[in-house]
Amino acid sequence: MKNVIKLLAKYDVPTIEKSLVQIFLDENNLKTNNKFLNEYLDSFEMIDQSDIDKIVLKNGETLTFEKFERYFELLFHSKDKKLGGIFYTPAYIAEFIVDEVLTDNPDFKVLDPSCGAGIFNLVSLYKIKEKFPDKSYVEIIENNIYGCDIEPISTNRTKIILILAALLHGENPEEIKFNVITHDSLDKSLKWDEKFPEVFKNGGFDAVVGNPPYIRIQNLEDDYKKYLQNNWASAKSGNIDIYYPFIELGLNLLNENGRLGFITPNSHFNTAAGKNLRKILKSNKSMYRIVNFDYIRVFQDVNVYSCVSIFTKKPNDEIKFRKMTEEVSSLDLREEDYKLVNYDTLDSEKKWVFLSDEEIEKIASIENVGTKLKDLCEINCGVATLADKIYLLTDYEVTTEDGETFNIEPGICKSIIKASTLHNEEEIAENDLKIIWPYNEEGNIIPESTIAKKFPNAYAYLKHVKPKLDKRDKGKPNEVAWYAFGRRQAIDSSFGKKLLTSTMNEKPNFVYCAEEDSTFISGYQVKTNKMDLEVLKKILNSSVMEYYIGLISKSYQGGWKSYAKSFIQNFGIPRFTAEELEFLENENDQNKINEFLEDIYFNRAVKTEKQTKLI
């Protein structure tokens, strides 16, 4: 990528592109008879030889076809990449997808409806040649490979990459009949059956493959946005992404035995906007195989959570699902690496969590073992000032951005804990973070006149920063008082003994806070007077909770999981016997606690009348 940036700093894209083609031909001693390629290379100014030596061929390297192809993929301005939703597809992804859709039919027809620089067309060419070695490269290009893209530069690149692949293998015809067209694939005026009658005489394509663009609907022109909403069922409502209708299109273009293979974001599984697409996929039962990369980044230069999906025109009884947990450079997966997911477990109106029957049974065991956490405890988020930099203090002496210093009175401050950075009880003991607290013991706002009289320094400070406070919440007036917190939440519920946890954790991390006068921000509290909080902490930090969250919660980069209320609230707390409670109270070895709890949650099928209610 750095080499491309260096070239883009000095030359325009067509100059770089044509220079790379010429360098590749020269480096590999290739002469072309192809009219399209010769016209393309006619009359352009080559990049400087010094840049060829220092950047393209640095350290005496040869411009191999793989490197050339990589340059072509990266030759989009960063701005264009963002707006066009274009991301470089790793070769192992394209190879896996093509392997999944390729058949034994020598007349196999495969389309990439957003072909970009031609990676899927190229991989399809090689895979078909490998399966049918008697077919020439040109014959495959002319009879098996199809492409479409909205950008002429992309369809040209696809043609060039296919010409060079044939040329590299000794095939040098003057003309090649390409099945690559320049058009918006989502435009319903495009009559695919008229463009490619030889395909649709058999009902459609044998396969559709690709890496469709990822563009949120709010980044599209209004007219195009309305067009998609009016013409594609998957896009009719919500903040959809343009890859949704590409999936719908791909399924529409398949013949009765066809397969669709895409790499896309996995957001349609769990967003409200993905509901209409989920309805289509469930009603058709078209999902056949899914490799979910979860929090693993496939595209190194962009933060997209991805999945590979293989769909079929014919309905499937089950979905073969695999979640990846580490970075890979190939997808050499066996059938036993997948778990089977029943379509009946998926509700289009809700987020999709792909679970096997065994996992569903274990989740049911966990949630129904006793009392749900939400019925036993209060689960609340912390205070929300909407201006933490103003209200939070590490020292009572505060200096503002414009150099004014104020000595805030301790009497208007409370101790506050930042749950998002909290690891253990020792950090609570060492915590010196304070918050200006303009509320009385009942949680009501202290009158402005009272603050001015009792806490003149704090009042002067708040008046000084009032312009910033007034900008909170998009400038809407604060209905309580201009110096009140931005939200009412947790003002009267965040004190007392509690368990604190961050919204995101690598593993369960519920920390006991015995300081009743401390409030908190940036996380959740779990409070109850029905059970010893230190015993509850051991349960919530157990391997059972980690397993449960691993199955039902949202993933983030690095393997972190969400511990938001919506994910932890249905976790079940068993009805322990007095003897079991005594064990939990006295045992501090978490491994022994885990073993004990796993037996209760998963092996103790019948609860007897001897069990006590929660204390």
Where do the PLM segments sit?
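Polybasic, glycine- and aromatic-enriched phosphate-binding surface used to engage nucleic acids
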Residues: 251, 352-354, 358-583, 590-612
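A solvent-exposed, charged loop/short amphipathic helix patch at secondary-structure junctions
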Residues: 38, 42, 226-234, 436
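Conserved acidic residues
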Residues: 108, 178, 206, 288, ...
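Conserved residues in the N-terminal Rossmann fold of short-chain dehydrogenase/reductase
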Residues: 147, 177, 181-184
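Signature of N6-adenine DNA methyltransferases within the class I
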Residues: 92-93, 115-122, 129, 150, ...
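Class I S-adenosyl-L-methionine
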Residues: 1-150, 154-157, 212, 239, ...
